[in-house]
């Protein structure tokens, strides 16, 4: 006796059993802040791994308890149906706020497991640029002048700095791991200390009631000529009191735009620079042209044509041939030209540039150091205060925020019994597979990588050379129940050569019979599965059966 099961019939598990299972969250990471849009919304991309057959993954965010109340808790939302390969990836729309993230996974009506991640934010992301009153200074830091820490839990940075000297082409930034900003922390990629940004972060979180993240691509002591030269030519070595590494100082800003800003989004670049142009006596037209060039290149390189800049008006300097502290009006006039204060017919006027704080008048004891250049003591808080005044409602209403670019998704297919062939789409370029914590070692530069047990990610570039990192995929030693078992040719159920994975299906596997193929369960044997999808045929002989 025999019978044939028709095409396109799907057998589903009829009896649910309680299975001990685990699920984790590998993306995002704790304290990450994602840029919101002007409607107070952003997409959070969520990914992780699970260890048993799953047909649905859900997620929600829970607003952390704070005074005043903040955030909007969401309901459980399906982020992926029928994930495969022990890996899930989905998206959740979230309002501005500071959250704990939860995920859970199901098999039918059976809840298999949950996982949680504390402190995930949707708020405002800023990229700082300029010279030492933007970055802090390593010598001043060693003297104890580093600015106040952030007291609010919601002020996030990546505590990392690019080693000096590094050419632009040699900058490899690590995967972002966020911390609350402490006084002596670096602010990736090249910020030296908290400076005024911890105090500004506290003020903004209190005022806006959303988390704040800072990145810092400035360089102490740099003039606008060096910024223009390196923005225009990534191999240039500008002379700025010394010969700078190739592509610097702009290279650090560009690296941050391509890496951190691509992944987390951005509201604006905050620019504080002009003191060095005072001592160099740069004229108005030159400074304006330099700054306009840097802004234009930042938009061109990042693919963000309306990237907002907030330009502070700064020029005060003392030192070298300048015996007494002075300001330099040509720099201030040029900054006003770029902003548009002198009208939009000025040749260096640039759209989407906003007026920053006027800082030259901030002088006095416990405001600046003896050189009358660098802020110190209460001066950091005063500087933060004037920045806060300029980041006003008009600025947030009229600036164009850029939300994070989705991280690349991964697909997987078994490559023998113990390897998984993981693949990233070829819409990207320069794939770089890695398996270390910082995601900066290089295992392969192919679009697919055959991997054994372990944790893997891939770095890729988009059409604007932005660098994106996939969420981590965990490849277990035993694939049973995680990877669909697919027929690769007609044959018998209990012959491993019938199956693409080279493994006979078991009661925990999702089995697919491919179109145009027929699989035979031999007499007296049982074909076991968890879920069965028929695109081809199954043939049963006497006393043979299927069982789930």
Positions of the model-derived regions?
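Extracellular beta-sheet-rich ligand-binding/adhesion modules
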Residues: 482-548
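Cell-envelope and extracellular/periplasmic
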Residues: 22-404
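A short beta-strand segment in extracellular, disulfide-stabilized domains
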Residues: 43-47, 416-426
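Extracellular recognition modules
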Residues: 102-104, 457-461
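Bacterial Sec-dependent N-terminal signal peptides
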Residues: 1-23
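Solvent-exposed loop segments of extracellular immunoglobulin-like
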Residues: 424-435
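Edge beta-strands of extracellular beta-sandwich domains
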Residues: 110-122, 465-479
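Solvent-exposed segments in extracellular or luminal domains encompassing
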Residues: 442-456, 511-515
